[in-house]
Amino acid sequence: MHIGVPLEMQAGETRVAATPETIKKLISQGHRITVQRGAGIQASVPDSAFEAAGAVIGEASEAFAGELILKVVAPNDNELALINSGSVVIGMLNPFNNELIGKMAERGITAFALEAAPRTSRAQSLDVLSSQANIAGYKAVLLAAHHYPRFMPMLMTAAGTVKAARVLILGAGVAGLQAIATAKRLGAWWKAPT
């Protein structure tokens, strides 16, 4: 099967849908992979790493010509025009965007929205939401610490003592638990209402 990994075109998107490690596994199973030139640059993965894993580096039209297309976010209208009828697109496709889903259906494209995969032990390898929420919880506390005008941990100096920052974390899901752990590691006093 020919698998395409295009460059993500959404503003601010720095992720890539496949890593050299996953590409190596797919190639060992007999698949042919085309990665769009520069697809991994924003994720700190150069084209040479994909080539070393066995992928072919190509243009957008070649990556979108795959029978299976791996995307991080849903394709835009320009990208949809490059996808062949009968192709399969896998990624975080926003299954509640009826307009986009309708356009894919009209073009004969099969779509698998990973964010709609059940969050069960059996489907755990498809769970993209937990990993993204984990990163979001971590980053939220780092951003809060950056914007906080004082310090996160308690500091005792010759000039006096600075109390630890008080952090309120709303929610105790995957993101909330990671936020609690990060705030604690930074030395803040934290609270999460139950």
Where are these regions (language model features)?
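Glycine/serine-rich phosphate-binding loop and adjoining beta1-alpha1 elements at the start
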Residues: 2, 8, 78-166
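An N-terminal-biased, well-structured beta-alpha scaffold segment characteristic
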Residues: 2-103, 107
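Glycine-rich phosphate/diphosphate-binding loop of Rossmann-like nucleotide-binding domains
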Residues: 6-45, 151-194
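Generic secondary-structure signature for well-ordered alpha-helical cores
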Residues: 28-32, 55-56, 71, 106-110, ...
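Short, Lys/Arg-enriched charge-dense amphipathic segments
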Residues: 57-65, 104, 135-147, 172-187
